[in-house]
Amino acid sequence: MVNHIRIFDNLFQSNISKFQNLTSKSYIIRNDNEKNSYLPMVQEIRELFGKEGEIFSKSIGTHPDFFGIENTNEYQYICSLFVDISGSTKLALKYSLDKVKLYKNAIISSAIEIFRAFDGHIHRIQGDAVLVYFGHKELEKSDAIINAINAASLMQYFNATTLKKFFESENLEPLKIRIGIDFGDDSSVLWSKYGIDGINEITSTSIHTDLASKFQNKAPSNKIMIGENINKYLDIPKKFRSIKIEKNNGVDVEKRYILNTNNLGRYSMEVFEWEKYLNSFSMLPPFSTENEQFYSPRDLKIRCWIIDEKNQDKYEYIERGSALKKEMNLLFKLEIYNQCLEFKNIKWRVVNYGEEAKKDKELEFEMNQYEGYQYCNQKTAYTGLHFMECYLYDINDKIICHDSFGLFINDNNREVRKLGIED
């Protein structure tokens, strides 16, 4: 991931520079010429994950889908993300209030830009916490959830790299960022106006929005806690999920549930292992290359295209930028960038996860018909996050290196938990 630290370093530094300019007499002139100078970093993130067009939301408060609500109610799904940034108050022990405000604002603003890069809508800033909505009426539910976990993962990466480096340079302890995410389906999220004339807001009423905040509070430091519906909708591989462990009188105790009552039943929570998740991307460098002579995307990379047979065309699918529908024809290609990477043979392997693939006993299989080729064809079939793996062998049939490409598949017809009483 080293190459991508630059994006976050530039994003953070640009926000510091931007807010420093607010106190400069030359700000108005510079702002007219450079008011979008920080946007290229956001655009880099969007392009990296295949996001096209303008960002979804450029405002705070009312979700753009519900500007017209007056005295009515509307039901529509949403994926809620709540992030809390703790530790920035220590800045007040070392700096003047002006400088504390500068750094805290740069941190919050950088977080906002990361969420907006994934089409998140900033609903509310609460001190050092931010409530973000992912999803809108034109977006598939699976893509809203994918956007949320991708944004949350990069937010934690931003903290583990750029922000950690900044705080250590100031001889301060790094920040502790906790993120909670949950999903409420259409019948479980009510949008309406709260308050009185002139003092009101349009917001969501949903236990799943409330639970996002609870999950944040339950998350370990610098981790992401996801609700049961997140996994139910995407069917995330177990290797990217774990049960929170707490010590009780020296004994490890599993904390599986956020709700465990007779009237509401059980609702589970899990830690989303964002480090393992990001480290499994073909398009992102690994966190450590110490034992790797060749690795993606520096030396090689798998790319994927959707084959549109009807129109005799193809479109590139950016890794895990969105979910693919079932029964889509795909073309995978291995691109070699390092001329020193000499190999004798290539083998392709499909690794599926999830209940649907498990039921059909199609979890893993070799693509023998494509042995020796730098490409292979496959079709989407099962809901979940699956991987196409490619292995390169030397003349002695020993593995030189390998790469894997992850893709989400979802028919957006998933059953999720509906808590409480429906109208």
Swiss-Prot record:
The UniProt entry, under Gene3D superfamilies, shows: Nucleotide cyclase
Class of enzymatic activity (EC top level): lyase
PROSITE patterns given for it?
GUANYLATE_CYCLASE_2 (PS50125)
Give GO cellular component annotations, separated by semicolons: cytoplasm
Q: Which InterPro entries match?
A: A/G_cyclase, AGS_C, Nucleotide_cyclase
Q: What is its EC number?
A: 4.6.1.6
Q: Which Pfam families match?
A: AGS_C (PF18134), Guanylate_cyc (PF00211)
Residue span, Guanylate cyclase domain: 79-184
Q: Which GO terms describe its biological process?
A: cyclic nucleotide biosynthetic process; defense response to virus; intracellular signal transduction
Alphabetical UniProt keywords: Antiviral defense, Cytoplasm, Lyase, Manganese, Metal-binding, Nucleotide-binding
**What positions does the entry give for a ribonucleoside 5'-triphosphate binding?**
F82
Chain sites annotated for binding Mn(2+) 1: D84, D128
Q: Where is this region: AGS-C domain?
A: 290-409
Q: What's its catalytic activity?
A: CTP = 3',5'-cyclic CMP + diphosphate
Q: List the disulfide bonds.
A: none
Cofactor(s) for this UniProt protein? Mn(2+)
Instruction: List, in alphabetical order, the Gene Ontology terms for molecular function in this entry.
Output: adenylate cyclase activity; metal ion binding; nucleotide binding
The listed locations are: Cytoplasm
User: Which parts of the sequence bind Mn(2+) 2?
Assistant: D84, I85, D128
Q: How does the annotation summarize its subunit structure? A: Homodimer.
- Give the domain section of the comments: Has an N-terminal nucleotide cyclase domain and a C-terminal nucleotide sensor domain (AGS-C).
What does the UniProt function comment say about this protein?
Answer: Pycsar (pyrimidine cyclase system for antiphage resistance) provides immunity against bacteriophage. The pyrimidine cyclase (PycC) synthesizes cyclic nucleotides in response to infection; these serve as specific second messenger signals. The signal activates the adjacent effector, leading to bacterial cell death and abortive phage infection. A clade E Pycsar system. The pyrimidine cyclase gene of a two-gene Pycsar system, weakly generates cyclic CMP (cCMP) from CTP, has little to no activity on ATP, GTP or UTP. Expression of this and adjacent effector SaPycTM (AC P0DV39) probably confers resistance to bacteriophage. The genes are probably only expressed in response to bacteriophage infection.
Give the UniProt family note: Belongs to the adenylyl cyclase class-4/guanylyl cyclase family. Pyrimidine cyclase subfamily.
Protein's name in the database: Cytidylate cyclase
The organism of origin for this protein: Staphylococcus aureus
Traced from the root, the source organism's taxonomic lineage reads: Bacteria, Bacillati, Bacillota, Bacilli, Bacillales
Give me the gene this protein comes from. pycC
